[in-house]
């Protein structure tokens, strides 16, 4: 009985003594995430959103403890934002209207032999630290750079931070902080004959004029390959054989915004509504749940140190295999 009381506390606190506890919690949250507001009105409206999110998190975690969900949520630095605002300000996948796959760029998996049961490129030293795109729709640039970094390590043995800002400023087919697409980025690096390192061309989180300098060049690209649409088995092969792969997902749900640990699976995730680009750096299984290991670009304070485990072989959950691609180096 005591166990149930503990479980119900977070939900009950809203009903029993909301104000004092919430006041303290709110002040602590603001301090932790260095939040400042322009006016009292602004702060009140943000606090209402934060309270709604906190309640959502508490109820979800209560359900998770009763076995309803395979993942848990936690309050984070996005606490005073609605899920619509997160999509608007912190995603940025823009698929070209004319996008059609050609046989020239289609990845044809080598089905010989078995793919390993699990792969984690973080352990192999293929993955740079988690970055934060800020309030710029540049997810596509971070996803592209992550895939290029993996191939650079594979080819040269060197792990190096490449420049998403180079892509934000210089890929004319994309729209900078207004959004873009990964294969456009790979094509730019190919035509440009290179991409600068992060040190040579640091990230500023807004679109500026193109300042690419060949002296800062750290990697090249010979083109790209696209995974057959919606084919998770082909995506698994690509991750196992090639390295980290750029993928697009639906990141529009509140459950994604506050993901903390476990294997993320939300039936409301829409595989036809892809809005965010991330990086698949491996796959595996946790407590019987197959998953993809996904690197996000919302900083280390988001998710599990910047990562999320997303359901694998669950009918292409969140559309993870719909727009997957990787660069050739």
From Swiss-Prot:
SUPFAM superfamilies xref list: Cysteine proteinases
Propeptide: 16-114
EC annotation from Swiss-Prot or TrEMBL: 3.4.22.38
Keyword Lyase (UniProt): no
CDD domains the UniProt entry points to: Peptidase_C1A (cd02248)
Any Pfam family hit: Inhibitor_I29
Alphabetically ordered keywords of this record: Cell membrane, Disulfide bond, Glycoprotein, Hydrolase, Lysosome, Membrane, Protease, Secreted, Signal, Thiol protease, Zymogen
Compartmental location: Lysosome; Secreted; Apical cell membrane
A Gene Ontology biological process term: proteolysis involved in protein catabolic process
UniProt catalytic activity: Broad proteolytic activity. With small-molecule substrates and inhibitors, the major determinant of specificity is P2, which is preferably Leu, Met > Phe, and not Arg
SMART domains in UniProt: Inhibitor_I29, Pept_C1
Job description of the protein: Thiol protease involved in osteoclastic bone resorption and may participate partially in the disorder of bone remodeling. Displays potent endoprotease activity against fibrinogen at acid pH. May play an important role in extracellular matrix degradation. Involved in the release of thyroid hormone thyroxine (T4) by limited proteolysis of TG/thyroglobulin in the thyroid follicle lumen.
Annotated protein name in UniProt: Cathepsin K
Phylogenetic placement of the source organism: Eukaryota, Metazoa, Chordata, Craniata, Vertebrata
Gene symbol of the encoding locus: CTSK
